[in-house]
Structures are given as structure tokens and as C-alpha cells.
């Protein structure tokens, strides 16, 4: 058994069946003591690493063997951790507990944060022109320069967005124009392939029957229009087309 070898083969009243339990005392056998040291040292270093990773703790471990050999581990810096320890001890004058040290640290941090909040609030009030009565001419010039630089950046960003929107609308206009041309070409081709469609009210000749566009001084009124066919004999026809003339006239 390994534990027997560590104890030099001596039986112990603390030894149990299965995994044994040894008495914690100095191992007299040099070889067994060195083997035990290596095993326990590795386990201690592993535990220190796990503690630093799992608990986000600052850990520093220093071990000297019986032969004077140094073994150390630190997740940050052994020297830095020692300096922090010395500072904590000196600040507390060797009388404070860990809880008191932590409380003092958090009080200092909260005081710094409160000071930063007050400084930011004062700066915002100055930018809004609320607390400029007690400012010197130099401070006012500095504040004016800050505001001008801020306005310049804001206008630059605004113009950038406007130009981007204009560019998008222009591209959109070109796309719509191209789509319109394609649709017109398809309609014309469809009418050429199907001449009967042009005779329908929805055909291209239907546009020729519509009156010319009106100016603003002469609004459109459907009662001012009538068909020429109403003024001509019912039997009048074109000899070539064989249909009535439907040219629209406007009463003035």
C-alpha cells in the first residue's frame, strides 16, 4: 500500500479498510517524504488554479521544499499580490478584518463614482446653458468651442444622411423609369401581336380619344365634351376603316 510506504510500514490505528487514512505527522523516510511532497504539491497547485478560475479570485501560492527549492503559482503576479497584501495590512494597521477591508474598498469606489456622476451632471448643465453665470471668460470660450465642434459633427452627420436619402431616391426614380419603359414596350408589342385589343376601350387608341390636358385656368368638365358623331348623320362612315369618327371636341 502507498500509505504504508509513506509511514515506513508502521500500522496506524487511524487506518481503515479500503482507502486508508493516515495520521498527519512528519514522514521520517526521506524517499517517501519526497514522493508525498511531489504528489501533494501538484494537488495544491491544481486547487489554486481551480479556485482562481471558478471563483475569479486573485491567488498567489508560494512553496519551499525541505531542500529549499521554490515552487509558486499566481493567476496575476506573485509580486503584485504580495504588494496588495502588504497594502491591505498597512492600511488596516493590522487590526481590521477582511470584511472591513472590503467595505473600505467599496466605499472608496462608490465615492469615485459619485464624483464622476456629479462632474458629468455639471458638464451637461453647462452645455444646456444653465450654470454659466459663474464661469470665467476663458471657460465660456472653451464651452463655446465644444458646442461649435458638436454642432459641426451633428450637421455633418445630418448632411450625410440627407445625401444618402437623395441618392437612394434618385436610384429609385431611375429604376421606376426603366420599369415604366419596359411595361410600355410590352404593351405596344402585345397590341401589335393582337390588333383586336387596340379597338377596345382599354387599348392604345383609347388614349387618342381623351381630350388634351387642361390648364389651371380651364378645369376639366365632362359636360363640355361630346362626340362628333352626334352632329353627323348616323350612316356616315370612313371608307377605309369602316367605323365612326370619335374625335373629341371641347365646347368653349
UniProtKB/Swiss-Prot annotation:
Location within or outside the cell: Nucleus
Subunit field text: Homodimer, capable of binding to CArG-box sequences. Forms a heterodimer via the K-box domain with either SEPALATTA1/AGL2, SEPALATTA2/AGL4, SEPALLATA3/AGL9 or AGL6. Heterodimerization also seen with some other Agamous-like MADS-box proteins. Interacts with AGL15 and AGL16. Component of a complex made of FLOR1, VSP1 and AGAMOUS (AG). Binds directly with FLR1.
One GO CC annotation: nucleus
Residues of the MADS-box domain: 19-73
Up-regulation conditions: Negatively regulated by the A class floral homeotic protein APETALA2 and by other repressors like LEUNIG, SEUSS, SAP or CURLY LEAF. Positively regulated by both LEAFY and APETALA1. Repressed by silencing mediated by polycomb group (PcG) protein complex containing EMF1 and EMF2. Up-regulated by HUA2.
Keyword Coiled coil: yes
Pfam families in alphabetical order: K-box, SRF-TF
InterPro entries, per the entry: MADS-box/MEF2_TF, MEF2-like_N, TF_Kbox, TF_MADSbox, TF_MADSbox_sf
Keyword Transmembrane tagged: no
Null mutant phenotype: Mutations result in the replacement of the six stamens by six petals and of the carpels by a new mutant flower.
Alphabetical keyword list: Activator, Coiled coil, Developmental protein, Differentiation, DNA-binding, Flowering, Nucleus, Transcription, Transcription regulation
GO biological process, one term: flower development
Domain K-box: 103-193
Function noted in UniProt: Probable transcription factor involved in the control of organ identity during the early development of flowers. Is required for normal development of stamens and carpels in the wild-type flower. Plays a role in maintaining the determinacy of the floral meristem. Acts as C class cadastral protein by repressing the A class floral homeotic genes like APETALA1. Forms a heterodimer via the K-box domain with either SEPALATTA1/AGL2, SEPALATTA2/AGL4, SEPALLATA3/AGL9 or AGL6 that could be involved in genes regulation during floral meristem development.
Annotated spans, Disordered: 1-20
Tissue: Detected early in the floral meristem but mostly expressed in stamen and carpel primordia.
Gene this chain is encoded by: AG
Native species: Arabidopsis thaliana (Mouse-ear cress)
An MF annotation (GO) of this entry: protein dimerization activity
Protein origin, superkingdom: Eukaryota
Lineage of producing organism: Eukaryota, Viridiplantae, Streptophyta, Embryophyta, Tracheophyta
Coiled-coil residues: 99-166
Protein name per Swiss-Prot or TrEMBL: Floral homeotic protein AGAMOUS
Amino acid at each position: 500500500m502507498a500509505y504504508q510506504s509513506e509511514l515506513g510500514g508502521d500500522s496506524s490505528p487511524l487506518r481503515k479498510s479500503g482507502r486508508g487514512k493516515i495520521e498527519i505527522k512528519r514522514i521520517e523516510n526521506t524517499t517517501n517524504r519526497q514522493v508525498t511532497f511531489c504528489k501533494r504539491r501538484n494537488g495544491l497547485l491544481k486547487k489554486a488554479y481551480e479556485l482562481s478560475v471558478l471563483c475569479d479570485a486573485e491567488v498567489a501560492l508560494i512553496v519551499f521544499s525541505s531542500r529549499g527549492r521554490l515552487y509558486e503559482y499566481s493567476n496575476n503576479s506573485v509580486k503584485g499580490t504580495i504588494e496588495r497584501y502588504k497594502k491591505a495590512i498597512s492600511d488596516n494597521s493590522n487590526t481590521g478584518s477582511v470584511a472591513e477591508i472590503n467595505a473600505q474598498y467599496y466605499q472608496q469606489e462608490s465615492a469615485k463614482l459619485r464624483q464622476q456622476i456629479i462632474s458629468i451632471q455639471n458638464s451637461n448643465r453647462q452645455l444646456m446653458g444653465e450654470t454659466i453665470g459663474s464661469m470665467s471668460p476663458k471657460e465660456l470660450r472653451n464651452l463655446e468651442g465644444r458646442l461649435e465642434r458638436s454642432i459641426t459633427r451633428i450637421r455633418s452627420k445630418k448632411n450625410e444622411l440627407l445625401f444618402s436619402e437623395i441618392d437612394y431616391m434618385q436610384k429609385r426614380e431611375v429604376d421606376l423609369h426603366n420599369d415604366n419603359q419596359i411595361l410600355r414596350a410590352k404593351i405596344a408589342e402585345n397590341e401589335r401581336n393582337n390588333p383586336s385589343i387596340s379597338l377596345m376601350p382599354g387599348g392604345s387608341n383609347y388614349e387618342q380619344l381623351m381630350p388634351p390636358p387642361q390648364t389651371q385656368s380651364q378645369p376639366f368638365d365632362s359636360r363640355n365634351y361630346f362626340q362628333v358623331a352626334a352632329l353627323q348623320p348616323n350612316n356616315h362612315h370612313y371608307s377605309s376603316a369602316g367605323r365612326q369618327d370619335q374625335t373629341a371636341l371641347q365646347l368653349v
